[in-house]
Amino acid sequence: MRKKLDIKKLVLLNLPYVFAFYFVDKLAEVFRLAPGTEFIDKLTGGFANIGAAFANPLPSFHPVDLLIGVAGGALLKLAVYMKGKNRKKFRQGEEYGSARWGRPEDIRPYMDDDFSNNVILTQTEGLTMNSRPKQPKYARNKNILVIGGSGSGKTRFFVKPNLMQMHSSYVVTDPKGTVLVECGKMLEKNGYIIKSLNTINFRKSMHYNPFAYIRSEKDILKLVNTIIVNTKGDGDKSGEDFWVKAEKLYYTALIGYIWYEAPEHEKNFTTLLELINASEAREDDETFKNPVDLMFDELEEREPDHFAVKQYRKYKLAAGKTAKSILISCGARLAPFDIAELRELMSYDEMELDCIGDRKTALFVIISDTDDTFNFVVAIMYSQLFNLLCDKADDVYNGRLPVHVRCLLDEFANIGQIPKFDKLIATIRSREISASIILQSQSQLKTIYKDAADTIVGNCDCTLFLGGKEKSTLKELSEILGKETIDLYNTSETRSTNNSYGLNYQKTGKQLMSEDEIAVMDGGKCILQLRGVRPFLSDKYDITKHPKYKMLSDYDKRNAFDIEKYRSHKLVVKPTQTFDLYDMGEVEAD
């Protein structure tokens, strides 16, 4: 499509050259009509009669005058072109870099006037929870990368202040279980439903059964993949070798059978373990059939195209010796389930993961910071959580959950690997879900997620550094902060019979904060980097200044939360509660 010609712009741009043509044309006329033959005489006479020449407003149409006028306009055009071509680009005070620290006016458009509707980042900076601000250019996702070495205050200066905001549902990784004790009562008093998954003390945990959240065959595949990724031993090559693929087939077949065929109370890991224990392969007898083989034979007779049957057929292609090795590997992988307490913990479900975005809920995931034996349980839970919430947002709520779900993932490197987390973190924003990834150093993320680590970091619009000394983290942060231009002067002294002194001023570039300066940063300070905004060097948030601080057990020990008392209290029937009554008819004794 041809672009429309802007006549007004064309006239304005060429008007100076028209004036130049007119002026030079008139001067040529004056010079031509001046008396005399010598150049000096004509020049003198021309200046004397210049007023009379311009008395006639029309240009001279004499060919010589017109030619000289055109030449004058062309020379002006050429001069303007050459000046523009050779123009110097000066950025006063920014010759070597324009980095600077952010100011209050820089963060103001990103914060909500209502303090309680902000994500707390520092003492002076925050981020509005409104995902659709009036001006879309100020919209930022709520994914946050928090980096802080041991003792830098990740829990005190970030996790607790944000729990006190109470504007969302929360899923909190809680090493040692202290956050639940300190913040649980505050949340309960403000109408939150409290859930707890405790992998340190199973008796203090609510029950979690991954089988309760299987909705389709693809969920079976996701569950199997999460188990494989988070329980692989040192002997596995890459997680995709022959043996692991064979294990996946076997797990998929068994879980598929349990999900389709078992009664509700048997849909759990205990049944899966019993099926594996009932399996047997004999190297010297390929025709031998164990109880599980017979069970699948019976299912195949009824439903030859059953999902579980198809997977089991592929597994049974393995020879006796190979099948025996697969069974040994499966048994070793699920060895933690030999612990009766773990089997009981995962026998049925109380978590209601798919309801966390429906109402204000706080789920505390308590893990050990010294032992990762049961971290695969946490990884399975998080994997199912993200997928369930995304599916519910899409299928029930037209793409956005009614209550925002914030995942405060403390000790993120210790909760196992969430499959395809790099893809999840890029898509959860639109569903009103966000993740705060809390690490001791950025290298921890690369250790777990390898090449996907950069994608995960790139999908966090906000980075908060609370302190640390890990070299790669310091280097990357210093580079991101950029360079500023500073003034530099040198002095020189020459000693001789005639002493002389010199003073030389110049400009140079310097990192806004070098690696060594970041390493020795004041313990009360932090660095905040928000996408599209200058970085901030600010005070860490003072938790005692929060309006809800007095509701924490930090302020008053009587505010300590007891999960066992809370669970027993939930079992007491209140007089005000209502129930649905179903008439089941008469029940005959056997």
Where are these regions (language model features)?
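Conserved ATP-driven motor cores of ASCE-family P-loop NTPases powering translocation/secretion/packaging/pilus
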Residues: I425-I527
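Basic- and hydrophobic-enriched, low-structure N-terminal and domain-boundary segments
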Residues: M1-S152, R156-V159, R203, E588-D590
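P-loop NTPase motor domains
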Residues: L10, F21, D25, E29, ...
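Short alpha-helical interface patches
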Residues: A53-N56, D65-N118, E217-I227, L275-A278, ...
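Low-complexity, polar-biased intrinsically disordered regions enriched in Pro/Ser/Thr/Gly
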Residues: L127-P133, K232-F242, L488-Q506
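General secondary-structure edge motif
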Residues: A99, G126, K142-N143, K310, ...
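A short glycine-/small-residue-rich loop at the edge of a beta-strand within enzyme catalytic domains
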Residues: R108-P109, F376, F412, G468
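Conserved long hydrophobic alpha-helices within structured protein cores
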Residues: F115-L121, F376-Q384, L477
